[in-house]
Amino acid sequence: PLSGAIMFSKWIAHSYYSEDMDIVGIIESFGGLSLSEGEAKAYEAPYPSGEYKAGPHVWPYLIPTQLSENEKYWVDVYENWEKPFLVAFGENERITIGMKDDFLERIPNPTVITLKGASHFVQEEVGPELAKIIDDFIKNNP
C-alpha cells in the first residue's frame, strides 16, 4: 500500500488535473473499502457530471498540511485544553496517522482509541461502534 503522504500528493494532483473526479475511487483508495454497486451509486449521486464536483476538487486544499499553519491553535487551544478530549484512529489509517503523536504530546490527557478493522473513513467502516464510543465518552464526561 502507498504511504499517506504519497496518497495525499496523488489526491492533490488528481483533484487539480481531473475534469471529472473519481469520487468512488477516492473513497475506496483512502478508506481501503470495496463499495457495492449500490454504495458506489450513492456516493456518485450528488454529482451527475464533473461540473458538479467543484466542492470535491477543493477538498485537499482545505486540509492544513503544515503544523505552522495552525500552530497558534495548537498552543492557544489544544495545549491548554482542560476538558475531556477523544481521539479515534482506525488501526489501518494511512492518511492522518502522523497526527496521532501530535495529539498525544500536545493535548493534556487525551483519550485515544484505535478502531479495529478501520482505515480512514471510520464512520463508514465502523459507524455503529464509533457512535457508541462517542456516546459513552459523552455520558462518562459530563
Task: Locate each region found by the language model.
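Ligand-binding pocket scaffold of soluble enzyme catalytic domains
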Residues: Y17, P46-P48, G98
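Conserved serine/cysteine hydrolase catalytic core
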Residues: E51-E105
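Catalytic active-site module of serine/aspartate enzymes centered on a nucleophile-bearing elbow/loop
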Residues: P110-P142
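Flexible "cap/lid" loop of the alpha/beta hydrolase fold
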Residues: P1-E19, I23
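Helix-loop "lid/cap" segments that line or gate small-molecule binding pockets
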Residues: I23-L35, A42-P48, P60-Q66
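Generic structural signal for small/hydrophobic residues in well-ordered secondary structure
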Residues: Y43, P56, V87-G90, F103, ...
